[in-house]
Swiss-Prot record:
GO molecular function, one term: snoRNA binding
Stated role: Required for 60S ribosomal subunit synthesis.
Biased amino acid composition, Basic residues: 475-486
Name of the molecule in the record: Nucleolar protein 56
Family indicated by similarity: Belongs to the NOP5/NOP56 family.
Organism: Caenorhabditis elegans
PROSITE patterns the record matches: NOP
Keywords, alphabetical: Nucleus, Ribosome biogenesis
InterPro entries in alphabetical order: Nop56/Nop58 (IPR045056), NOP58/56_N (IPR012974), Nop_C (IPR042239), Nop_dom (IPR002687), Nop_dom_sf (IPR036070), NOSIC (IPR012976)
One Pfam family per UniProt: Nop
Lineage top rank: taxon: Eukaryota
Length: 486
């Protein structure tokens, strides 16, 4: 049974409150009393009363204290408040607190103070939270609710800003969209080929690429009217990257095609669908460039080691870059092969050697006997790269490039027996090279920030000048005299 506290610390959005507890001989009795008084504010006020309250100076101070408490640190405002509010002789004083993480910091500030948490303290704080407006009669109730709302918004905003790896959320969504686009493009590409092959079946063999096929279908459309379009040959040449031989084959095959004639309405629908498919393929390429750019900002070392797409899939499967950095190399190795792993454990057969890492070029280069070894080694380097990217203030791709060279040296060792460099020597070289790159990146960021600030100031100045010009009184036009008309 926990000890009965003399005081309980309650952290409100408006400030710190010290609640005085009615004296009880046994914690079991106070627990029964508190449980019985939860629904009745008057009964609860007979057990708990407000001894002291210290409001925060402003919203910034409230947010600062809130962040300190969430990290388990006693803010100077809190220690000053307890120093003033608690009895001078703290040797036999028992203080109840909500969070056990705060105990260590308070014990350093008040060595003689006895701290308790959990059990009856939780119930007292729950009742205090419900009936605080009744207990704090002198405080305006509307200001308490406003303080809670303001602090809630500020704390949430600071947490979102503190998440330095929030860019990985964009990577996760983008790689999921890329995978979905690949499926849709393959499905739509086959559909347009089947549809247009009724009219021009030979084009399927002459243009196997889906993107070029879709563009050719839009350009040619009705093969019987190709002679009417004088610029058609140039369009086909452009689509086929100036391959004149292939262009001549397509034009010749269109003249002697065995396809059936299709109405203009059907051809119009084929044209619209083919244009949509080709635009989807163009957007897919743009999305790939976007993922590459995001990965260079979010995880440059991981991207340099195994490529943008495989790295993005690892982050997506782990849930975030932070989660991936926390995984051991053995988990990274089989990430994406969970079904095969559990099936192997259930049937007591061999566990999988790799998951998403199979799509890396290193696994394809390795021999059959060495695929498992290379997979283990690559997973180890991926784990290191993820941790470097996650916990570096200025992530750069230097470490990933050196780690990639290590994997290539290991492949060379398996094939020719050439002994690679020691890991400690490679990491020293990487550290020296990374320092120079980081300095350049920081300089670029500072220049970009200065430029953005200057542009913002110019924009504000221009807006202010425009408003002044609008507010300035316009000169009145003189009325023409009617004397001349008379």
């Amino acid at each position: 049974m926990s000890e009965v506290p003399h005081f309980v610390l309650y952290e409100h959005a408006a400030g710190y409150a010290l609640m005085k507890i009615k004296e009880f001989d046994d914690a079991g009795l106070i627990l029964q009393e508190v449980d019985a008084a939860h629904a009745d504010g008057y009964k609860f006020s007979q057990i708990v009363e407000l001894a002291s309250f210290d409001p925060f100076k402003n919203t910034e101070a409230a947010l600062e204290n809130c962040n300190s408490i969430s990290e388990g640190l006693a803010h100077p405002d809190l220690t000053n408040f307890l120093q003033k509010s608690l009895p001078k002789k703290k040797k036999h004083v028992v203080l109840g607190i909500n969070d056990s993480k705060l105990a260590g910091s308070l014990t350093e500030a008040f060595p003689d103070l006895k701290l308790v948490f959990g059990g009856v303290i939780t119930e007292i704080l729950r009742g205090t939270r419900v009936h605080f407006e009744r207990l704090a009669k002198n405080l305006p109730h509307h200001s308490l609710s406003k303080a809670q709302l303001s602090l809630g918004h500020s704390y949430s905003r600071s947490k979102v800003k503190f998440d330095v790896h929030r860019v990985d959320n964009m990577v996760i969504q983008s790689i999921a969209l890329l995978d979905q686009l690949d499926k849709d493009i393959n499905l739509f590409g086959m559909r347009i080929r089947e549809w247009y092959s009724y009219h021009y079946p030979e084009l399927f063999r002459l243009a196997p690429d889906q993107y070029k096929y879709s563009r050719l279908a839009v350009a040619i459309l009705d093969r019987n009217k190709m002679a009417e379009n004088e610029n058609l040959e140039n369009e086909i040449l452009e689509i086929l990257d100036n391959d004149s031989e292939k262009t001549a084959q397509i034009i010749e095959a269109a003249r002697t095609s065995m396809g059936m004639d299709i109405s203009d309405l059907d051809l119009e629908n084929i044209k619209r669908f083919a244009a949509r498919v080709s635009s989807l393929m163009e957007y897919r390429q743009q999305l790939h460039e976007y993922i590459k750019d995001r990965m260079d900002h979010c995880a440059p070392s991981l991207s340099a080691l195994i490529g943008e797409q495989v790295g993005a899939r690892l982050i997506s499967h782990a849930g975030s870059l932070t989660n991936l950095a926390k995984y051991p190399a053995s988990t990274v190795q089989i990430l994406g092969a969970e079904k095969a792993l559990f099936r192997a454990l259930k049937t007591r057969s061999n566990t999988p050697k790799y998951g998403l890492l199979f799509h890396s070029s290193f696994i394809g280069k390795a021999g059959t006997k060495n695929k498992g070894r290379v997979s283990r080694y690559l997973a180890n380097k991926c784990s290191i790269a993820a941790r470097v990217d996650c916990f570096s203030e200025t992530p750069v791709s230097t470490y990933g490039e050196f780690l990639r060279q290590q994997v290539e040296d290991r492949l060379e060792y398996f094939t020719s027996g050439t002994v690679p460099k020691k890991n400690i020597d490679v990491m020293k070289e990487a550290e020296e090279a990374a320092v120079e790159v980081k300095e350049k990146v920081i300089k670029k960021k500072k220049k970009a920030a200065k430029k953005a600030k200057r542009l913002a100031e110019e924009s504000v100045t221009a807006t202010a000048e425009a408003e002044v010009d609008e507010d300035a009184p316009k000169p009145k036009k003189k009325k023409k005299s009617k004397a001349g008309d008379e």
